[in-house]
Swiss-Prot record:
Changing residue 322 to C: In SPGF74; uncertain significance. GO terms for biological process: chiasma assembly; mismatch repair. Keywords: ATP-binding, Disease variant, DNA damage, DNA repair, DNA-binding, Meiosis, Nucleotide-binding, Premature ovarian failure. Residues 1-44 are annotated as: Disordered. ATP binds at residues 592-599. Belongs to the DNA mismatch repair MutS family. One of its GO terms (molecular function) is mismatched DNA binding. It comes from Homo sapiens. Widely expressed, with high levels in testis and ovary, including granulosa cells. Also expressed in fetal ovary and adrenal gland. The keyword DNA damage applies. This is MutS protein homolog 5. GO terms for cellular component: nucleus. Gene3D superfamilies: 1.10.1420.10, P-loop containing nucleotide triphosphate hydrolases. Involved in DNA mismatch repair and meiotic recombination processes. Facilitates crossovers between homologs during meiosis.
Amino acid sequence: MASLGANPRRTPQGPRPGAASSGFPSPAPVPGPREAEEEEVEEEEELAEIHLCVLWNSGYLGIAYYDTSDSTIHFMPDAPDHESLKLLQRVLDEINPQSVVTSAKQDENMTRFLGKLASQEHREPKRPEIIFLPSVDFGLEISKQRLLSGNYSFIPDAMTATEKILFLSSIIPFDCLLTVRALGGLLKFLGRRRIGVELEDYNVSVPILGFKKFMLTHLVNIDQDTYSVLQIFKSESHPSVYKVASGLKEGLSLFGILNRCHCKWGEKLLRLWFTRPTHDLGELSSRLDVIQFFLLPQNLDMAQMLHRLLGHIKNVPLILKRMKLSHTKVSDWQVLYKTVYSALGLRDACRSLPQSIQLFRDIAQEFSDDLHHIASLIGKVVDFEGSLAENRFTVLPNIDPEIDEKKRRLMGLPSFLTEVARKELENLDSRIPSCSVIYIPLIGFLLSIPRLPSMVEASDFEINGLDFMFLSEEKLHYRSARTKELDALLGDLHCEIRDQETLLMYQLQCQVLARAAVLTRVLDLASRLDVLLALASAARDYGYSRPRYSPQVLGVRIQNGRHPLMELCARTFVPNSTECGGDKGRVKVITGPNSSGKSIYLKQVGLITFMALVGSFVPAEEAEIGAVDAIFTRIHSCESISLGLSTFMIDLNQVAKAVNNATAQSLVLIDEFGKGTNTVDGLALLAAVLRHWLARGPTCPHIFVATNFLSLVQLQLLPQGPLVQYLTMETCEDGNDLVFFYQVCEGVAKASHASHTAAQAGLPDKLVARGKEVSDLIRSGKPIKPVKDLLKKNQMENCQTLVDKFMKLDLEDPNLDLNVFMSQEVLPAATSIL
């Protein structure tokens, strides 16, 4: 607004910056570029909601889910599933949906499965809501109609109905009947719940920015316990809960050391790859080719430049979603502009790289000229500095002559209003020392004069020829003939400019949304490049090598492998090799003292295999990975009060998963199974489980068992044959000390060396010596004599007396009363002994 002030001598002054009166809301502080960036980062860390729709019929599964983080519907073509619904369980474990939608008319197996899912208290707070919709909502024809009649921003408005059907048919497999019905039911649920648009007008539909297919056919089966014990993921409490929405951060884990992604969507894709390890050799080889290319010394500068560009790739789906809902922020245009220009930089860089690598070829071809069009439109239309200054969308000059003219008139108001105020002051009472003419959007032009001391009551505010409006900050505001004339002449310039610029913004949004498909593809390929650059960076720093994949090799071969986490925490790390291919040594029994490295070796084998199955280089000189379809572990008990299970019961559940599901191509890692119960029972269970697998012959899984049960070998509880191989951790006794070499070699440990471990733990020397003495006596079959220093006075004599009484007892005497004997003879003597 403009204003004019006059001093008591009634001399008009030049214009000064006006301020809105206290009766009107002041504009919000204008965020600078840094604040806008921080605001965007917070948006990117919003927790996503996933809503899953599932149907199961005649042994086939139809699945579709909506992800609010990218406003995309993901679907899986009809896939066969067992009656136990293992495939559905895998999907649930992977995506953790907030709600599961299905038909009220459902198969008994599905009903039982969902009922069990809803009652799993240990899933809190992630337990999904189970929602049953009428079966009519999943009808095939009505589902097709919903899909074809949907309002999708990625489909141009110029498409005819026939072209729209052909376009959607190229994306959605309409021949997969269960999938189509699941998609239709999901759309019905989204429309009924109005996910993401709960507070919008009813004519605003749920934004859907695309359809994506996902497959689970080539995935390697890994359960949550395995992810936990191998430390593939590890969440820790964040020191500042304000930094992360969930209050958690990644701890020391495989994901933590490999995650060097520069954009949030790269990090998200890396996590997805970790949850979906695959044995698809084509996909794995394509990932390794990119990593190997960037590991070449001459390509280091190119990798760094690409990483810098990827740092500007932001959350495009969130921006497109806000455009769809007309909730675009000022910072969104700048973020989108940087993202598109960075994508163009990626395209130009990849065009100079070898096109024999699939990813470079895809980026060079699919980052089309639509990106240039979007960047050019935004760059020519949006006034970034003006938008940040006014905290709203503004356009550059020479876009709309009418807007430019109104802005010129608005900019010329201060000097014009100075002249108007001078004329108004001439007509006012001489007691009024000064006046100003101000402009307030939506209200118009007003005459503002200071409140005089004589103006006490409301009636004193009346001035002839002026209409009193309001009092604010000791200023009286009036409408005069001239201000009314200004309103009629100039109108509400500010609001008119704003309305016209909003219309231009809407037109620009439509242009961007019409090309949403290319932006979505940009994000997919850029995030893939980001992940592979991150894996290449980790491989370079940690000295990883490229694994080989051989479907003919049944197992894993590792030359001088290392534990990827342990080698970062230890000063020195001893590498170990692994050979478990073919029909020999499919069951490896590893014995050795505590702290000799058995558990680390098991985890090392599991982690190297896992890294190879996500397409990463591995910590080994050489690694050859065969056809592995699952990794099962029984290494650590994930205890929880909410489970209501004992430690041993949890161990049994983990082993049961492996026994029931492991195939000839599975890798099974078992550490100290049976220690949670009686020694004899634990040993018997371990032997029974291993004999069960050995009975399968060549179809036995690849099993690594670490145990301290030396009796398993000494008593020959396992059948002899080429399937069993005994390994031990090499050690050496140096006087009273035990030296660990942490090297795996063939053989069997001679002793557990528990006394050395007890001494290292700080137990008193007397206790350690006594324990060793008792152990030697038991092993040699000799009687154990008590320690005299620990006996009470006359304790041995009292024991002998009690034994003599039992020996003299005549059990055949008909007059014998055992109750009297126990109460009068035994109990008093036992009391004195104890």
